[in-house]
């Protein structure tokens, strides 16, 4: 009985490490991708158009004032992405990601249906579910949030 309990604890510890590694991978890829998109909007990095270029496009789809909204979206993506990636205030980072994706769905993708092949909501919807899933699960042991548990 004691050996069985020890084995069970060891297996649970291994499963926790694997789950935390999986959450770390998800957070890093999704969070840093969002941070990169924020840097595109704010600074024109990584092939982005900066606030003016992004603002012009936002105005063309009815989001005004374009430059201000580009800066706000860029800040939400940059800050939200970095928080999410680091696992620091993960729920706040996830909320910023979710808000940006909800706006993208409402203003760009909803009229095109579901599938990404027709510019539909598929991809932003998946990102919303990933962010929500991590927020509900927690950032895992390999996160800055874990330091405060």
What are these regions (language model features)?
Residues 2-48, 53, 59-60, 64-75, ...:
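Extended, low-polarity transmembrane helix blocks
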